[in-house]
Amino acid sequence: MGFRINTNIGALNAHANSVVNSNELDKSLSRLSSGLRINSAADDASGMAIADSLRSQAATLGQAINNGNDAIGILQTADKAMDEQLKILDTIKTKATQAAQDGQSLKTRTMLQADINRLMEELDNIANTTSFNGKQLLSGNFTNQEFQIGASSNQTIKATIGATQSSKIGVTRFETGAQSFTSGVVGLTIKNYNGIEDFKFDNVVISTSVGTGLGALAEEINKSADKTGVRATYDVKTTGVYAIKEGTTSQDFAINGVVIGQINYKDGDNNGQLVSAINAVKDTTGVQASKDENGKLVLTSADGRGIKITGDIGVGSGILANQKENYGRLSLVKNDGRDINISGTNLSAIGMGTTDMISQSSVSLRESKGQISATNADAMGFNSYKGGGKFVFTQNVSSISAFMSAQGSGFSRGSGFSVGSGKNLSVGLSQGIQIISSAASMSNTYVVSAGSGFSSGSGNSQFAALKTTAANTTDETAGVTTLKGAMAVMDIAETAITNLDQIRADIGSVQNQLQVTINNITVTQVNVKAAESTIRDVDFASESANFSKYNILAQSGSYAMSQANAVQQNVLKLLQ
């Protein structure tokens, strides 16, 4: 080998290796001090890109978890508020049930209604004030609200909370047929009861026999109420149009085929003869007699069979000729507020034929707070003599003395009706006058033209005008202040409870969905962080070994450079 002084190859190699080793030692120290395998892009370019992507995903998933927890907090707030509303509705239904018995007076029912009104106000107060971060939750505006629960955009869960104000819940469908005056076999089908299928009930006979009539039909309908969602009630009641006057029944007077015979009764049935005679056979006829607060005769079917009067009950009873055969009114109730579509055969026998006026209305909880409108009351079946939302007033005059107290009050001399004669005006008229109007009050004069049978000198009468006045037709009183109203409020409160339960069930489902999602993305976040750590974080055991290696190499490199420099001294020996 040659000896050179100008270029120390050994020293250069030792220096070069020392520089490389020093760089590796610096990297090792950097990794050990930071805990990261990748401290710069130069350490691992592709690894850094993957690690950064994983870090971003993990951070986003962390915020998604927070979003989900916020959503759960919102839904829990609404759920607890609705729990209080349900307690209020339970109390409302309890008070309506308390009012739904005739042991209550108008005064006590009015107090119960006042309590119900205050409860409704509190229910609405909860609905209008429950909020989260300034956002109303129960007002109906919290609809299709989205919560980001993924690392990528549009990975959301939607939540909707329905309105819970009294005007939005409890919407109950009431449908009541017209008064039925015909018997027969009825086949009833509810169309699309579940949105798809029809439900056909067994045929029911409408008659005056035991086990027939609207009572039997209502029983048949109610057996399947859980499936169809439709419940039925009935009202088979015949009420006189005026207070009982003195009169006599005929020898062949009978109710539902059971002969009662001749009865002499007094004004107001003060001797109790008429009511007692009818009630003496009530177990056979199924019809019970009573007097209402105005002294009118009331015949009520105990089991929903029809009421048929044959023979002559007497004009003093207040029962008109067209009332002698009565099969009542059928009322249907559906708690979801949707129309009740029916079809079948002989539906006119239950007042629901194509030509009958069927009263229909959907009523919310709030509408039971104030006065119930005439239309709603009719749909609920409040009055046996209403139909199609119209007020039907039928009046035959029982005694002239009740309508004329002196000459010149509407009847002229020679008319055939003297003051106090007791003659029945219906004898002079072939039919009663029927007024159908939705007006608040009625007072009209009906002028009789020539040829009508009431012209002067006709022998029927010598008056040229007939004056009629009917009582005001007002809305029914509020809520539970009547027995029928209390029953209706029970139905409405039950619907409202069902509505809130449905909303709460939806909220619960979304909460569960959110919780499952949070659990899933929490696991995903852990795995993503683990993957990032594998790429980015340093393995201290491995790196410590590397550090020891590079540290020893650094020391040996220094020794090598020292020895390489000493080699040049050997040239001097050649010059000695």
UniProtKB/Swiss-Prot annotation:
The keyword Secreted applies. Disulfide bonds: none annotated. It is found in: Secreted; Bacterial flagellum. Keywords: Bacterial flagellum, Secreted. Pfam families: Flagellin_C (PF00700), Flagellin_IN (PF07196), Flagellin_N (PF00669). Disruption phenotype: In a double flaA-flaB deletion, cells grow faster and are non-motile, flagellar filaments are non-existent. One of its GO terms (molecular function) is structural molecule activity. One of its GO terms (cellular component) is extracellular region. It comes from the Bacteria. InterPro entries: Flagellin (IPR001492), Flagellin_C (IPR046358), Flagellin_C_sub2 (IPR042187), Flagellin_hook_IN_motif (IPR010810), Flagellin_N (IPR001029). Heteromer of FlaA and FlaB. Interacts with FliW. Interacts with FliS. Belongs to the bacterial flagellin family. Flagellin is the subunit protein which polymerizes to form the filaments of bacterial flagella. This is Flagellin B. It comes from Campylobacter jejuni subsp. jejuni serotype O:6 (strain 81116 / NCTC 11828). The gene is flaB.
